[in-house]
Amino acid sequence: FLGALLKIGAKLLPSVVGLFKKKQQ
């Protein structure tokens, strides 16, 4: 279960970081 959660997090992380960077600009 934890492994699947990490895989999902790895997929979502780039998009979350992208949105955060857009808000800063």
UniProtKB/Swiss-Prot annotation:
Predominant place of localization: secreted
Keyword Cytoplasm attached: no
Expression (tissue specificity): Expressed by the venom gland.
Record keywords: Antibiotic, Antimicrobial, Cytolysis, Hemolysis, Membrane, Secreted, Target cell membrane, Target membrane, Toxin
GO cellular component, one term: other organism cell membrane
Family the entry assigns: Belongs to the non-disulfide-bridged peptide (NDBP) superfamily. Medium-length antimicrobial peptide (group 3) family. Ponericin-W subfamily.
One BP annotation, GO: killing of cells of another organism
A Pfam family assignment: Antimicrobial_4
Localisation per UniProt entry: Secreted; Target cell membrane
InterPro entries: Antimicrobial_4
Tree of life domain: Eukaryota
GO molecular function, one term: toxin activity
Function summary: Membrane-perturbating peptide with multiple activities. It is insecticidal, since it induces reversible paralysis in insects (L.cuprina) after 1 hour, but fails to kill flies. It shows a relatively strong and broad-spectrum antibacterial activity against both Gram-positive and Gram-negative bacteria (MIC<20 uM). It is also anthelmintic, since it potently inhibits the larval development of the major pathogenic nematode of ruminants (H.contortus, IC(50)=2.8 uM).
Organism (species): Neoponera apicalis (Ant)
Protein name from the UniProt record: M-poneritoxin-Na1b
